[in-house]
């Protein structure tokens, strides 16, 4: 899998004597979680994992060289059952996903580390990551953190409709890959589909509302796309990568500085 994580930040490139010598109380380990799942006719199955590698790798490049932060290898298989029925989607159950994160967390604690951040870029994992960040704190006393997607950055120049409902293989994901891995984007195969209209607020929304309906992609988007990839440009992808990486780097630095109240 292509990655932008600097070699010097890869936990798995250390040997055990180097791990033993790390400052365990201060070191922050980051566990990326993503997916291998359909992303329409134009983006690869690995889109969420590539975006995770891209944004985290760029953020890690921005940290001071002596900041003790290492990226664990990603959990590439996520809970993607919303995308079942499309060839290529590899989904694990919620129980399996949580068990893997729990056992990696146990190994982090057993190795003597204290700080662990979960960095997730697949929406179907988000509620599980939230649960696991708390459970790892409770079960192992780890100082856990959860970090999602762009780190909260509002990407410039995205329409209100796309911002609300372009959440799968739409403009943002397409732009990020156009800038980072253009050979993996088939610009002749764009499809457009919106699950709801931002101009017509409904009582039941698909996401981010107090009252929602639970959707499967095959119910609402035959091509597998929810959003509009057509406005995506490599230039915006590069700009948004930089914006997100800066925000993620700030979050990682705050996690490094974090001290629990005595
Ligand atoms: Zn995606």
Where are these regions (language model features)?
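Extended, histidine- and acidic-residue-enriched regions that form the cofactor-binding/catalytic faces
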Residues: 1-115, 123-262
């Amino acid at each position: 899998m292509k990655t932008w994580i600097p070699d010097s930040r890869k936990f798995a490139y250390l040997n055990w004597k180097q791990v033993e010598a790390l400052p365990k109380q201060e070191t922050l380990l980051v566990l990326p979680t993503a997916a291998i799942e359909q992303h329409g006719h134009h983006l690869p199955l690995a889109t969420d994992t590539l975006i995770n590698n891209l944004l985290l790798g760029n953020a890690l490049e921005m940290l001071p060289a002596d900041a003790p932060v290492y990226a664990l290898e990603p959990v590439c298989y996520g809970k993607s059952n919303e995308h079942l029925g499309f060839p290529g989607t590899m989904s694990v159950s919620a129980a399996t996903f949580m068990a893997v994160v729990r056992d990696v967390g146990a190994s982090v604690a057993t190795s003597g580390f204290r700080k662990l951040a979960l960095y997730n870029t697949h929406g179907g994992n988000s509620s599980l990551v939230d649960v696991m960040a708390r459970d790892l704190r409770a079960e192992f006393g780890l100082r856990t953190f959860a970090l999602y997607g762009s780190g909260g950055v509002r990407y410039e120049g995205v329409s209100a409709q796309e911002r609300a409902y372009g959440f799968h293989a739409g403009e943002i994901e397409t732009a990020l890959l156009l800038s980072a891995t253009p050979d993996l984007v088939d610009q002749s195969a764009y499809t457009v589909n919106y699950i709801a209209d931002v101009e017509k607020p409904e009582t039941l929304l698909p996401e981010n509302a107090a009252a929602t309906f639970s959707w499967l992609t095959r119910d609402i988007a035959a091509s597998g796309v929810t959003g509009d990839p057509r406005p995506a440009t490599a230039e915006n992808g590069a700009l948004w990568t930089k914006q997100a990486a800066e925000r993620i780097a700030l979050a990682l630095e705050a996690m490094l500085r974090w001290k629990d109240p005595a």
